């Protein structure tokens, strides 16, 4: 924390997990210490976890010297909701994303403008009920008129909250799937009657929360999914932090004499095509041994 103390809950969790070595440091300087090593901090092989812009830049600069998980940006959620969804629940999920700080993005893909308005009103009510916001923040919850963006209509909902719905003549489900895959959200919530069917069209998302009873908040704390997820569209090519981040795959190859004899002729042709004569010779020596 800002006072230099380590959160007691973090220390307790570390102890329960068998961690017996904890270093109290943070920021870009922590990344440098872990990557290069110091008199008190041993050098590591992998650095994981999100941070601010300085931490991201530090991780980018040491990548190659050590492995990193990702360059995590501001948190994101995209909620896809049909007409059967509960606007108040959707509103609460969007507002929860704002709690991750400035830059956090919360998007809604809705079936029509009426649903967007209902969610906007629910946001106003929830902000007034739960947050006791200042007049400045309360002013953000007004719902301005829509702006057409072609096949999809965008409607600001307030702050970093934005809602979209299909333009006239556009089908909701295909457009929603296209938005999901183009945006590649960190968190994707599906408030849909047939959420499982919609899943077949989803190719890019960090974590997917299926059904109206599965908000992102459960994934943040207790559902068991990892909270360190790809952001900024990187879900198109990256995955969540997991045990696999800390594992390395190795190829183990072993041939007996007979196998070497069978594989040497095709290897020789491939090697010759590239002009790698010693690759061919290396293999043919084993083939000759197999023939004896």
Residue ranges: model-predicted function:
Residues 16-107:
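Conserved NAD(P)+-binding/catalytic subdomain of aldehyde/semialdehyde dehydrogenases
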Residues 1-7, 25-33, 195:
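Short acidic loop-to-helix transition motifs that present clustered carboxylates
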Residues 20-23, 44-48, 52-53, 69, ...:
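Structural motif
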Residues 3-17:
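Active-site-proximal loop->helix
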């Amino acid at each position: 924390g800002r006072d230099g103390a380590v959160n007691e809950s973090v220390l307790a969790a570390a102890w329960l997990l068998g961690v017996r070595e904890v270093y109290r440091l943070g920021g870009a300087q922590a990344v440098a210490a872990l990557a290069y090593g110091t008199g008190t901090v041993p050098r590591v092989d992998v650095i994981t976890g999100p941070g601010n812009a300085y931490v991201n830049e530090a991780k980018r600069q040491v990548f190659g010297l050590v492995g990193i998980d990702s360059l995590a940006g501001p948190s994101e959620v995209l909620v896809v909701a049909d007409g059967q969804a509960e606007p108040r629940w959707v509103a609460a999920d969007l507002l929860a994303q704002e709690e991750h700080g400035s830059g956090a993005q919360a998007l809604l893909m809705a079936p029509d403008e009426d649903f967007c308005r209902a969610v906007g009103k629910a946001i106003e009510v929830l902000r007034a009920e739960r947050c006791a916001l200042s007049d400045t923040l309360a002013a953000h919850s007004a719902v301005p008129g829509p702006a057409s963006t072609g096949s999809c209509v965008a409607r600001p909902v307030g702050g970093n909250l934005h809602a979209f719905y299909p333009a006239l003549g556009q089908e909701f489900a295909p457009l929603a799937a296209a938005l999901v895959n183009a945006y590649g959200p960190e968190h994707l919530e599906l408030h849909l009657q047939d959420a499982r069917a919609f899943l077949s069209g989803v190719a890019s998302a960090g974590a997917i929360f299926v059904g109206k009873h599965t908000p992102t908040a459960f994934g943040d704390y207790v559902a068991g999914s990892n909270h360190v997820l790809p952001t900024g569209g990187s879900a198109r090519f990256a995955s969540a932090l997991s045990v696999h981040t800390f594992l390395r795959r190795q190829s183990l190859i072993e041939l007996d004499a007979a196998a070497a004899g069978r594989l040497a002729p095709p290897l020789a042709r491939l090697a010759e095509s590239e002009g790698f004569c010693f690759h061919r010779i290396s293999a043919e020596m084993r083939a000759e041994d197999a023939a004896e």
